[in-house]
């Protein structure tokens, strides 16, 4: 054999021996790992068994503790319940003993009442016997007296009663008269105290109302623009408002004259806006007058709300509040009716409080007592009748309605508050300087002029201007033609002559205006 072959054989032999040796080595290593894993598993199992045993013991201990706790709590609860039951039993026994004692007491009282009843029956019998004996004695004495005096019992009784009546009647009359005098003196004294206290606690200011307003101008050139070409601007403003515009030498001022304060205020606002705007022509004047009317209406509503707030009267109907605000622009003998109504409300409330009456209801009645004056120039009837109608319409309290109806003595007052309203009205009106007779007569004459003019069919509106020396009547052109306009002027003139007393003469002007308006599109 060659040496290479020998080396090959040796290499094969060595590889075989190495493979066998490696096999046994790996086998021993694997067996060692298996034995180690088994030992580890046994160790883990032993630890798990020990832990489980410990947990079991711990759980048993906790269960025993919990059972002991529950048993202790149950015993305590049972002990408490037994104690409560024992207390209830004791209370029941005590109540039973009390009932037994009360029963015994009632029995004793019943026996005592029976004894008293027997005693009363015996006494009643004795009294009846005595009454019978007394009656017999009285009858015998009456018979003896009748025999001696020759008078029957009825005759003697009549004589005695007559003497007693004559003596007592005089004494009663004297006592009644003295009581009446004392009552009147005390009533007068109390009334004076109440009135003086109310007057001292009520402070009201009154400013004499005038029939003119002044609009300031930026310069005298504005007067010519207000007059307009051929006077058309001033005529339009006077026709729409029913107010006289007096443009004289007064520097930078125009005077508005009119008896109706609402119209005068509307004209003042409109003219003031026109002066500020600078555009003064008939169409613009109509627009401003209409806008001013809306502003005045809104201001009137605000005045009514402010008045009710100041006086402390709440719950008035919104329409009644607006009518109340109109009183700011009404006067009675020169006295502002709204201020007068507020003063009457305060006085009535103060006097009602002194007498223990409803102060809020008294103020309400005092505030509304002259509500009819707000529209008496628009609706037929006296301001009392109109006020009653308004209060009834808006479902006011019956005391308020009666106070309105009776404050001038037209009907009888049915409550103390109605009497107080009449007294407060007299106090407010009779105060020196509160009213002016001349101004009131003047305003009534102007109102009568407008009333006569507006009573004819076809008349849309009328305005008394020039201090009552002229009345302008606006008629409906579709109802009154030109010939009827002349006839209407004559009829109104005759009625004015027959029904009114006035100095000088009154000019009657009937205005009939027809407008044709078309819009190009």
Swiss-Prot record:
Where does this one sit in the cell?
Cell membrane
Per the UniProt entry, the Enzyme Commission number(s) are: 3.1.-.-
- Bilayer-crossing residues are 5-25
Instruction: List the record's Gene Ontology CC terms alphabetically.
Output: plasma membrane
Read off the SUPFAM superfamilies from this record.
Answer: Eukaryotic type KH-domain (KH-domain type I), HD-domain/PDEase-like
Chain intervals for the UniProt region annotation (Disordered): 87-117
The protein's matches in Pfam families, at most eight in alphabetical order, are given as: HD, KH_1, RNase_Y_N
Q: Does the keyword Hydrolase apply?
A: yes
Write one Gene Ontology MF term. Answer: RNA endonuclease activity
What PROSITE patterns does the entry give?
Answer: HD, KH_TYPE_1
The family database entries (InterPro entries) matched by this protein are listed as: HD/PDEase_dom, HD_domain, HDIG_dom, KH_dom, KH_dom_type_1, KH_dom_type_1_sf, Ribonuclease_Y, RNase_Y_N
GO biological process entries = mRNA catabolic process
Q: Which family does it belong to?
A: Belongs to the RNase Y family.
Write the protein's name.
Answer: Ribonuclease Y
What are the top taxonomic ranks of the organism?
A: Bacteria, Bacillati, Bacillota, Bacilli, Bacillales
């Amino acid at each position: 054999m060659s040496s290479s072959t020998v080396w090959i054989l040796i290499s094969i032999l060595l590889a075989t021996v190495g493979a066998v040796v490696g096999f046994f080595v790996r086998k021993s290593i694997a067996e060692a790992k298996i034995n180690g894993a088994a030992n580890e598993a046994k160790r883990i199992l032993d630890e798990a068994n020990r832990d489980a045993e410990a947990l079991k013991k711990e759980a048993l201990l906790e269960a025993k503790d919990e059972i002991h706790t529950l048993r202790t709590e149950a015993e305590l609860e049972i002990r408490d319940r037994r104690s409560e039951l024992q207390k209830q039993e004791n209370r029941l026994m005590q109540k039973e003993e009390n009932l037994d004692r009360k029963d015994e007491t009632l029995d004793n009282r019943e026996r005592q009442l029976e004894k008293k009843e027997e005693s009363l029956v015996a006494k009643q019998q004795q009294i009846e016997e005595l009454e019978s004996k007394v009656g017999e004695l009285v009858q015998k004495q009456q018979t003896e007296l009748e025999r001696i005096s020759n008078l029957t019992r009825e005759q003697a009784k009549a004589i005695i009663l007559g003497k007693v009546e004559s003596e007592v009647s005089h004494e009663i009359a004297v006592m009644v008269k003295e009581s009446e005098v004392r009552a009147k003196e005390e009533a007068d004294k109390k009334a004076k105290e109440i009135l003086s206290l109310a007057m001292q606690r009520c402070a009201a200011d009154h400013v004499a109302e005038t029939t003119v307003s002044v609009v300031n101008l930026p310069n005298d050139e504005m007067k010519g623009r207000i007059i307009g070409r051929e006077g058309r601007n001033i005529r339009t403003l006077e026709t729409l408002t029913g107010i006289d515009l007096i443009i004289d030498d007064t520097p930078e001022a125009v005077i508005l004259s009119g008896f109706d304060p609402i119209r005068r205020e509307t004209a003042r606002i409109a003219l003031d806006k026109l002066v500020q705007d600078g555009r003064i022509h008939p169409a613009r004047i109509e627009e401003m007058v209409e806008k001013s009317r809306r502003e005045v209406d809104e201001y009137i509503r605000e005045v009514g709300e402010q008045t009710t707030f100041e006086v402390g009267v709440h719950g008035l109907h919104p329409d009644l509040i607006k009518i109340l605000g109109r009183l700011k622009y009404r006067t009675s003998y020169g006295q502002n009716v709204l201020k007068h109504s507020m003063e009457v409300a305060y006085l009535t409330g103060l006097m009602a409080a002194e007498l223990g009456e409803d102060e809020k209801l008294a103020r309400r009645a005092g505030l509304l007592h002259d509500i009819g004056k707000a529209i008496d120039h628009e609706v037929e009837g006296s301001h009392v009748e109109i006020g009653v109608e308004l209060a009834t319409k808006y479902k006011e309290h019956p005391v308020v309605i009666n106070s309105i109806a009776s404050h001038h003595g037209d009907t009888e007052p049915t409550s103390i508050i109605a009497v107080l309203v009449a007294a407060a009205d007299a106090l407010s009106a009779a105060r020196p300087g509160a009213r002016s007779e001349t101004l009131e007569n003047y305003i009534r004459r102007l109102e009568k002029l407008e009333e006569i003019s507006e009573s004819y069919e076809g008349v849309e509106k009328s305005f008394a201007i020039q201090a009552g020396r002229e009345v302008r009547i606006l008629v409906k052109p579709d109802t009154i033609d030109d010939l009827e306009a002349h006839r209407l002027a004559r009829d109104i003139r005759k009625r004015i002559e027959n029904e009114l007393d006035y100095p000088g003469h009154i000019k009657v002007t009937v205005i009939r205006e027809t407008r044709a308006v078309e819009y190009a599109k």
